[in-house]
């Protein structure tokens, strides 16, 4: 019985992780560099940009756009093979 509960929890966690998506700094498609932003306008630029990339929302964090709830296939800074070419 306990094993069944553990398996059920594992399946639920896997499904929820896929549904919620991933978070990260979105990158320019041509350079793989982060989108820079003004930290004093935390949501104004980044939220629409992130939503255009498929995220739930986004905000300026450490002078770059951090997106929340991105689709798994969206490339973010730090993914394997993402290097800024600028």
Swiss-Prot record:
One of its GO terms (cellular component) is extracellular region. One of its GO terms (biological process) is defense response. It is found in: Secreted. InterPro entries: LCN-type_CS_alpha_beta_dom (IPR044062), Scorpion_toxin-like (IPR003614), Scorpion_toxin-like_sf (IPR036574), Scorpion_toxinL (IPR018218), Scorpion_toxinL/defensin (IPR002061). Residues 22-85 form the LCN-type CS-alpha/beta domain. Expressed by the venom gland. Gene3D superfamilies: Knottin, scorpion toxin-like. Residues 1-21 form the signal peptide. GO terms for molecular function: sodium channel inhibitor activity; toxin activity. Keywords: Disulfide bond, Ion channel impairing toxin, Neurotoxin, Secreted, Signal, Toxin, Voltage-gated sodium channel impairing toxin. PROSITE patterns: LCN_CSAB. The keyword Nucleotide-binding does not apply. Pfam families: Toxin_3 (PF00537). Disulfide bonds join 33-84, 37-60, 46-65, 50-67. Has the structural arrangement of an alpha-helix connected to antiparallel beta-sheets by disulfide bonds (CS-alpha/beta). Belongs to the long (4 C-C) scorpion toxin superfamily. Sodium channel inhibitor family. Alpha subfamily. Binds voltage-independently at site-3 of voltage-gated sodium channels (Nav) and inhibits the inactivation of the activated channels, thereby blocking neuronal transmission. This is Neurotoxin LmNaTx35.2. It comes from Lychas mucronatus (Chinese swimming scorpion).
